[in-house]
Amino acid sequence: MAVPKFKPSKSRSRTRRSINMRKKIPQLQECSNCGYLVIRHRVCLKCGYYKNIQYLELGL
């Protein structure tokens, strides 16, 4: 069975794990109906549209 020859440094270990520590920023795009920034592939919470089809009736 293979055994590591040297102990990995803190820098190497933390660099490898750092990908999990990054903040995940949501992907935003403009609503095609009102121009409000919304998360991709979701209904716009301001106007209720997604891909020019109304899914929510909002009494604004």
Curated annotation (Swiss-Prot):
<comment type="similarity">
    <text>Belongs to the bacterial ribosomal protein bL32 family.</text>
</comment>
<dbReference type="InterPro" id="IPR002677">
    <property type="entry name" value="Ribosomal_bL32"/>
</dbReference>
<dbReference type="GO" id="GO:0003735">
    <property type="term" value="F:structural constituent of ribosome"/>
</dbReference>
<dbReference type="GO" id="GO:0006412">
    <property type="term" value="P:translation"/>
</dbReference>
<keyword id="KW-0689">Ribosomal protein</keyword>
<dbReference type="Pfam" id="PF01783">
    <property type="entry name" value="Ribosomal_L32p"/>
</dbReference>
<protein>
    <recommendedName>
        <fullName>Large ribosomal subunit protein bL32</fullName>
    </recommendedName>
</protein>
<dbReference type="InterPro" id="IPR044957">
    <property type="entry name" value="Ribosomal_bL32_bact"/>
</dbReference>
<dbReference type="InterPro" id="IPR011332">
    <property type="entry name" value="Ribosomal_zn-bd"/>
</dbReference>
<keyword id="KW-0687">Ribonucleoprotein</keyword>
<dbReference type="GO" id="GO:0015934">
    <property type="term" value="C:large ribosomal subunit"/>
</dbReference>
